[in-house]
Structure formats: structure tokens, C-alpha cells
């Protein structure tokens, strides 16, 4: 029991394997697992679109259900005449986060040794979640400005100029809430699984892992839905 407690206390958080590139420090383990997630998505896309049939069957049929689900995320949050152009972006967010989260929950990355730290889900790193949130932030500003031009900024003084500071603060808190919600949930899930594995090494905590997979899926859905919602708000007409 004492040795288990010592192992739990020795779990490293925030230890990174840095790559030096043009004087910049890059988190190597984050990029490696991100590439794995991207390769998996590309392979699935190739398999699903290879030798396509008019009447979809098997894996092609499954992918069409997935596409309809992803399309509905955008359709339910963005106006009918605008949502189609945002389906690729929202779908990419969801799929990357979903696959990254599941890779972190299912793959025993600790078995792969690297010089420093350990491999984990890309969403286990705050830099990844902040980058995804900033992409969303840039997207809803682009959506609003492309439709309304400089009139977009009138929303900050609507319905009264008194709300200007609050409305500006709201736009800054959106990416913060997106990034920290995703990061916090993924880190907490991985830590819980790690602690259970150390406390009960002979019995893999399957219920905890299943709960983690469910929570990971929900987090991907929440992130994509909120991103679509923010874009929809930017495109909506304010009276």
C-alpha cells in the first residue's frame, strides 16, 4: 500500500519532451499523438470513400450516419442558409477531439518510452485546447465580419452602450471556457484511471474506463456544439 501511495505521488503532470525548432520549444509528445489521430482520421476517410456505391453498405453506410450526425450539429446551431459552409470546420473539431480523447483513454501510451514525460492525448495539454479554442474564436469573428462588415461590432453596444465592457469580456471568456473545460475534464479522467490502476493493479478498472470514454465523447460534442453556437450567434441578425 505504501509503495502504491508513493507511485501515485510520483505521477508527473506537465513534464514535456521538447523539440527545438528554429529557436522554439515544441511539445514533441503532443505532436506525435496528434499525428496519430490525424492519420487514423485520414485512413478512415480513405476506407469509407474508396469504391463508393450508390446504395451505401457496411463502412460507407456507417460513415454516412456519422456525417449526418456531424451535419446536424452545425444545422441545429447555425442558420439554414449558412450552416453548410461551416460543416467541415465543426466536423473537423469534433472528430479530432473525439479521436484524441479516445486515444488517450484506450492506448497504453506508458508502454512507449520517450526521453522525457510520457505520451498522452493531445487534449491532455492546455496548449492544444487553447489552440482549438482560438481557432473557434477566429472563426466566429470571421463569420460575423464576413456577413456584416464593421456593423458586426455594433453588437457590443446592443441593446445599450452600458453593456460594452461586459460584451467585450464575454468574447474573451468564450475561448477560455472552451479550452479549460476540455483540458480539465480530460486530465481529470486520465488521472482517475491512473490512480485506479495503481490501487488495483490486478483488476483493470473497466467501469472507470467506460465512463471515461463516455465523458470523452461528451466533451467532444460539447466543444463542437458550443463552437457552432458561437458562430451561429455571430451570423444572427441582432435587432
UniProtKB/Swiss-Prot annotation:
Annotated InterPro entries: ATP_syn_F0_a_bact/chloroplast (IPR045082), ATP_synth_F0_asu (IPR000568), ATP_synth_F0_asu_AS (IPR023011), F0_ATP_A_sf (IPR035908)
GO CC annotation: chloroplast thylakoid membrane; plasma membrane; proton-transporting ATP synthase complex
Membrane-spanning residues: 30-50, 87-107, 126-146, 191-211, 212-232
Pfam families in UniProt: ATP-synt_A (PF00119)
Main location: plastid
GO molecular function: proton-transporting ATP synthase activity, rotational mechanism
UniProt cross-references to SUPFAM superfamilies, sorted A to Z: F1F0 ATP synthase subunit A
Protein location: Plastid, Chloroplast thylakoid membrane
Keyword annotations: ATP synthesis, CF(0), Chloroplast, Hydrogen ion transport, Ion transport, Membrane, Plastid, Thylakoid, Transmembrane, Transmembrane helix, Transport
Highest taxon listed in the record's lineage: Eukaryota
Metal-binding recorded as keyword: no
Membrane topology of this protein: Multi-pass membrane protein
Cited Gene3D superfamilies: ATP synthase, F0 complex, subunit A
Protein family (similarity comment): Belongs to the ATPase A chain family.
Function comment: Key component of the proton channel; it plays a direct role in the translocation of protons across the membrane.
Quaternary structure note: F-type ATPases have 2 components, CF(1) - the catalytic core - and CF(0) - the membrane proton channel. CF(1) has five subunits: alpha(3), beta(3), gamma(1), delta(1), epsilon(1). CF(0) has four main subunits: a, b, b' and c.
Official protein name in the record: ATP synthase subunit a, chloroplastic
Gene for this chain: atpI
Amino acid at each position: 500500500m505504501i509503495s502504491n501511495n508513493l507511485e501515485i505521488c510520483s505521477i508527473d503532470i506537465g513534464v514535456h519532451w521538447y523539440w527545438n525548432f528554429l529557436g522554439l520549444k515544441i511539445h514533441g509528445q503532443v505532436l506525435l499523438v496528434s499525428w496519430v489521430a490525424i492519420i487514423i482520421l485520414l485512413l478512415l476517410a480513405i476506407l469509407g470513400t474508396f469504391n463508393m456505391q450508390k446504395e451505401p453498405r457496411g463502412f460507407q453506410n456507417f460513415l454516412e450516419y456519422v456525417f449526418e450526425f456531424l451535419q446536424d450539429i452545425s444545422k441545429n446551431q447555425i442558420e439554414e442558409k449558412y450552416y453548410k459552409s461551416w460543416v467541415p470546420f465543426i466536423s473537423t473539431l469534433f472528430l479530432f477531439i473525439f479521436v484524441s480523447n479516445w486515444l488517450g483513454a484506450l492506448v497504453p501510451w506508458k508502454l512507449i518510452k520517450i526521453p522525457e514525460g510520457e505520451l498522452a492525448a493531445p487534449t491532455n495539454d492546455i496548449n492544444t485546447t487553447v489552440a482549438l479554442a482560438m481557432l473557434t474564436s477566429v472563426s466566429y469573428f470571421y463569420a460575423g465580419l464576413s456577413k456584416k462588415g464593421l456593423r458586426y461590432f455594433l453588437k457590443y453596444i446592443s441593446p445599450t452602450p452600458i453593456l460594452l465592457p461586459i460584451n467585450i469580456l464575454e468574447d474573451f471568456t468564450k475561448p477560455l471556457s472552451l479550452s479549460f473545460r476540455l483540458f480539465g475534464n480530460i486530465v481529470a479522467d486520465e488521472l482517475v484511471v491512473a490512480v485506479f490502476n495503481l490501487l488495483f493493479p490486478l483488476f483493470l478498472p473497466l467501469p472507470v474506463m467506460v465512463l471515461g470514454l463516455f465523458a470523452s465523447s461528451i466533451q467532444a460534442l460539447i466543444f463542437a456544439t458550443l463552437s457552432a453556437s458561437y458562430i451561429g450567434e455571430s451570423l444572427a441578425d441582432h435587432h
